């Protein structure tokens, strides 16, 4: 049986390009990542967070919603990517070729 003395503090973190929010939540052992996010009420500050589909992590490692969080860990809420990384890299490479900073055939650096 767990009691109030067994509780520990977990930080829930969400960051935007211009701001970040950290909310500390006191939880019982065995609490899942998504339950901690719900308890933090981060959605009231950032309504764009969709709890059913949001990706969560612990110290930069993606975890499942039902992952049990341990003392000393923090829960990170990840935003979806705005652009496909492959497309961004391809556009950057094409721009370098057009500007003469990359070989038009191989894509490597110009000597």
From Swiss-Prot:
Give the start-end ranges of region Disordered.
88-111
Sorted alphabetically, which Pfam families does this protein's record hold?
Ub-RnfH
Name the family.
Belongs to the UPF0125 (RnfH) family.
Instruction: Spell out the protein name for this chain.
Output: UPF0125 protein SO_1475
Give the source species. Answer: Shewanella oneidensis (strain ATCC 700550 / JCM 31522 / CIP 106686 / LMG 19005 / NCIMB 14063 / MR-1)
Q: Which classification does the entry list for the species?
A: Bacteria, Pseudomonadati, Pseudomonadota, Gammaproteobacteria, Alteromonadales
């Amino acid at each position: 049986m767990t009691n109030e003395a067994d509780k520990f503090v977990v930080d829930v973190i969400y960051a935007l390009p211009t701001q970040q929010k950290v909310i500390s939540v006191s939880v019982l052992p065995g609490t899942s990542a998504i339950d901690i996010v719900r308890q933090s009420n981060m959605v009231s500050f950032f309504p764009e967070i969709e709890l059913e589909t949001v990706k969560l992590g612990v110290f930069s490692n993606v975890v499942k919603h039902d992952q049990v969080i341990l003392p000393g860990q923090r829960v990170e809420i990840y935003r979806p990517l705005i652009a496909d990384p492959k497309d961004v890299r391809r556009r950057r490479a094409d721009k370098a070729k057009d500007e003469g900073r990359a070989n038009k055939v191989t894509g490597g650096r110009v000597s």
